[in-house]
Amino acid sequence: MIVDWYCLKERERGKIGGPNKIIQVDESKFGRRKYNRGRRIDGHWVLGLIENNSEDFRLIICPDNIRDAATLIPIIKKHVQEGSEIRTDAWRAYSTLNQNGYTHNVVNHSDPDNHILARDGIHTQRIEANWRPAKDWFRQRRLPGYRFPDALVEYQWRRECKKMNLDPFEQLICAIVANYKFK
């Protein structure tokens, strides 16, 4: 039901950003550490986009768990208006954003002097701060991997209800009425 609602909303809402608008973009892996050790994580890569001064936080699963430029740039183009300023980390897949109609600014998290702010003061802290609540929500539910896409939509729906101070039950009823015809 919520997935149907999300698909309807996805068609209705336009792209984020535009001239003089800043979009923070980052990718993160959702999953569990293999054997509870080290950095190896089995799971799903998700691309997150958020516009400064907006609550429109978009999460898109990277197809086939691939996060190269050939995969990420079309996703960004689908969700972000050209002319936007995009701020990312130094992941090489973002290196062609300038050639795709965007102003691209980079924060190098491996810079030993300052891994949070770039030298010119730009940062990606807003998108980074949104990963923790999302991952905590998934961690609490311990869902099997095949349920991840639907659960990601449910998380976004619940987040939107909370941010807009809406009753989730009432919104569920509205989604049912909007998506199904009753005789």
Where are these regions (language model features)?
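Residue-level recognition of single "structural anchor" positions
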Residues: M1-K183
